[in-house]
Amino acid sequence: MNYVQQIRDKAKLILIDVIILSVIPILALLLRFEGVIPAAEFMVFRNSLPWMVMISLAIFYFYGMYHRIWHYARIRDLIAIIGAVTLSQAAIFIVTVMADIPVPKSVTILTWLLSICAIGASRLMFKVNLDMVTESKGNKTNLLIVGAGDAGAMLVRELEQNAAATTNIIGFVDDDEKKRHGRLAGFPIMGNINELPQIVKANKIDEIVIAIPSADGDTIRHIDSQCHQTGAKVRIMPGIYEMVTGEMAMGQMREIRLEDLLRRDPIHLDFAKITNYIAGKTVLITGAGGSIGSEISRQISRVGAKEIILLGRGENSIYEIHQELKRKFPEQTYHTVIANITDKERMARVFRKFQPQVVFHAAAHKHVPLMEIQPDEAIRNNVFGTQNVAELADKNHAEIFVLISTDKAVNPTSVMGATKRTAELVLQEINQHSNTKFVTVRFGNVLGSRGSVVPLFEKQIAAGGPVTVTHKDMTRFFMTIPEAVQLVLQAGSQAEGGEVFLFDMGKPVKIKDMAEDLIRLHGLTPGKDIKIIYTGLRPGEKLYEELLTSEEGTTSTKHKKIFKAHIQPLDEQDLKASLQTLNETTDRQTILKTLKHMIPTYKSKQLENAN
């Protein structure tokens, strides 16, 4: 129902009421005088009828009789009819008394009773007619919108323009009680979110669309849990970030994703500061084909870098991100480089050729169990690869170097975490003798990355289960990829040199709960349709992650979601000696003992078992 249809329906109701209000008084007179109306009485009514009808229509209008949703009429609507008719007849009676117009009281009472019956019957017929029209649209999808705000109104316009032939919009639900029983874009606001199951059942809803782009994860989770009870298909409008970046348009809809359930307040960035250190600069991104590296390249492209060098050793991933960026940002200059960060000569040629002013170092090995098996490769890539790129940045006078680290570097129990902590120490040492500002950013898991648990869970659910979780109490910090990269860029703008920045990761999330959420998002029931089994912790895995060691403290920064850790660098000579040992050996026990020497909080099961 659109605005034109709404006006038509109001006009129909007013016309019906005019006919009823004109006929009922004559019928009351016929009953009063047993079928023969005296000429004098008839003349009085004929002259009075126009203003009586006008008074009744005015009272009906202000009483809301033409704003009600008769398609969903209930007992309270019948009470409203009684109230409106009673008020109008009382007003007419007062006028006739004051104007000394002779109207028998019995006629007034009969008119009151007959008007209630006739107007009530007209509304019932109106409801039946609308129900028949709705049923005739059986090939259409009955759609309910959650969120009676600007986004909901925009969605209605989009659907009426592009999906009118297949979609029958029924109305809205919204938790704002002030909106209850009102209308938006011509459609009724039918109740609140907790009433979703009843509303869906009563109105045969096929699909529910969540139209609250600013809603946080807890709100989305609550709405989804209510929707899950209905059996209706559920979709969602994009979040604020997706619309701002152009990833999705306002009127588009998609399935609910896990990241929707983890939404936090939008991050407010100081774009002026980010622009100051990136705009017009040559930027090198290592690991540019990975989850974090590719998102850094997207966001930097919006800032307006002079040139962006996309470096990685996997040709397919570099090719894919390059094609995407060229399509989205045709004015931006890109260079693709296939190289291994541990290849000193190759990387030196890259730095000499492009002379990058800003470096984002996202290249790393990150799979914990794999690095437990081959610690020498983790050392070569995560430690010496980082050292190689950092020293070249210093030698070629880069302005800022940002290392992407991990919460697994804190009190590490894995080789991967220990090598990332070592890379942080290497960066701090280089920073002490360089004009380049070297900083580290530490954060937890990112949703949607190729190494996260989510893709694994998705495959297991698609295969019919079971979903494998290592431990029922395992928790992790999670951020979305765009959220993490926004904070990486902001942290870079605050760099003075030597800092380790931490992000506000929100509350840790139980992996078990995440698995259950994903199962429900597929319309299935955890434990019934898809089993969850617990496999035990893998080598190097923690039950929970930390962002700080017990010795470290933090201070706030100018951004409320970014903190600076107080970390003491390792003795320079000790660091160099340890790095030399790591560089000269491939022996597993020597590597683990050296890492333990450099990082006293490192706890290695392999070392403990060897002892």
Regions found by a protein language model. Give the residues of each.
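N-terminal Rossmann NAD(P)H-binding glycine-rich loop of SDR-like oxidoreductase domains
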Residues: 283-301
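Conserved Rossmann-fold NAD(P)-dependent oxidoreductase catalytic core, especially the SDR/UDP-sugar
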Residues: 245-246, 361, 365-424, 431
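Flexible, Lys/Arg-rich cytosolic regulatory linkers and terminal tails that connect or flank
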Residues: 222-282
